[in-house]
C-alpha cells in the first residue's frame, strides 16, 4: 500500500443508549482517494443522514474501503460487563477482525480500546471530523438497524422496526405491558422497572 492513509482505521459504535439488542461497532480503512470520493458524496456522521442516504453511502463505503469489519457485544455481555465495557469490546472485535492490521486506529469518543495491539488515538466527536470514523459510524448504524428490524419479526409488539431498540414511548409502554424479551438489557433501568410488580 503506497498510501499512508490506507493504514488508518476509523472505529465507532452504535446502540449504546438502546434498551434492546446488541451494541455494534464498525471499523473502516479508507485510502485518500476513497475519502475524497465519499466526502464528495456527502459522507458525514451517520446521525445527520437519512436512512436512505446512509444505505447508499454504506454500499459505497463497502465498495471503496481498503478494509472494513463489524463487531458486536451481546445483550448478555452488556448486562455482565456494563455498556461502556461492552462497547469497547465490540470495537476491539471489529478492529481485530480486519484483514490487515492498521498502523493507527482513530476511536470515536474519549475512551481507549483496552488490550488493542494497535496504536490508537481517541477523537471526541470524531464522526464529525474524521472521515474514517464517519464511515465506521454509517456501517455500524446500518448494520444494527437492519438487525433490529429482523428481530422485530421475532419480538413483535415493541415497535422495534421504528424505534430501533431505543426507549420510545411505545417501547416503554410495551415493556410495561409485555415485559422484557431475551434481547432487552436488564441492567438498564426501564427494563428492570418492567420486572417489578405494579
Curated annotation (Swiss-Prot):
Keywords: Cytoplasm, Endonuclease, Hydrolase, Manganese, Metal-binding, Nuclease
GO terms assigned for molecular function: manganese ion binding; RNA binding; RNA-DNA hybrid ribonuclease activity
Gene Ontology biological process terms from the UniProt entry: DNA replication, removal of RNA primer; mismatch repair
Cofactor: Mn(2+); Mg(2+)
Enzyme class, first EC level, given as a word: hydrolase
Annotated catalysed reactions: Endonucleolytic cleavage to 5'-phosphomonoester
HAMAP family: RNase_HII_B (MF_00052_B)
Family to which the UniProt record says this protein belongs: Belongs to the RNase HII family.
Pfam family, one: RNase_HII
Binding site for a divalent metal cation: 12-13, 108
Residues annotated as domain RNase H type-2: 6-198
Cell compartment(s), UniProt: Cytoplasm
Predominant location category: cytoplasm
Extent of the signal sequence: none
Organism name: Acaryochloris marina (strain MBIC 11017)
Entry-linked InterPro entries: RNase_HII, RNase_HII/HIII, RNase_HII/HIII_dom, RNaseH-like_sf, RNaseH_sf
CC cofactor note: Manganese or magnesium. Binds 1 divalent metal ion per monomer in the absence of substrate. May bind a second metal ion after substrate binding.
CDD domains per the UniProt record, alphabetical: RNase_HII_bacteria_HII_like
NCBIfam families: PRK00015.1-3, PRK13925.1
Role according to the record: Endonuclease that specifically degrades the RNA of RNA-DNA hybrids.
Name of this chain's protein: Ribonuclease HII
Enzyme Commission number(s) from the entry: 3.1.26.4
GO cellular component: cytoplasm; ribonuclease H2 complex
Amino acid at each position: 500500500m503506497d498510501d499512508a492513509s490506507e493504514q488508518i482505521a476509523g472505529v465507532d459504535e452504535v446502540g449504546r443508549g438502546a434498551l434492546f439488542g446488541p451494541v455494534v461497532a464498525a471499523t473502516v480503512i479508507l485510502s485518500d482517494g476513497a475519502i475524497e470520493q465519499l466526502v464528495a458524496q456527502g459522507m458525514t456522521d451517520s446521525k445527520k443522514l437519512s436512512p436512505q442516504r446512509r444505505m447508499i453511502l454504506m454500499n459505497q463505503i463497502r465498495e471503496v474501503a481498503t478494509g472494513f469489519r463489524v463487531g458486536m457485544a451481546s445483550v448478555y455481555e452488556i448486562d455482565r460487563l456494563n455498556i461502556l465495557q461492552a462497547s469497547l469490546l465490540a470495537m476491539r472485535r471489529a478492529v481485530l477482525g480486519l484483514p490487515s492490521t492498521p498502523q493507527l486506529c482513530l476511536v470515536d469518543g474519549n475512551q481507549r480500546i483496552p488490550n488493542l495491539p494497535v496504536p490508537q488515538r481517541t477523537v471526541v466527536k470524531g464522526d464529525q471530523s474524521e472521515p474514517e470514523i464517519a464511515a465506521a459510524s454509517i456501517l455500524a448504524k446500518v448494520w444494527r438497524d437492519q438487525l433490529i428490524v429482523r428481530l422485530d419479526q421475532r419480538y413483535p409488539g415493541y415497535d422495534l422496526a421504528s424505534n430501533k431498540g431505543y426507549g420510545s414511548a411505545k417501547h416503554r409502554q410495551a415493556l410495561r405491558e409485555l415485559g422484557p424479551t431475551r434481547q432487552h438489557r436488564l441492567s438498564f433501568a426501564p427494563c428492570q422497572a418492567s420486572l417489578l410488580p405494579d
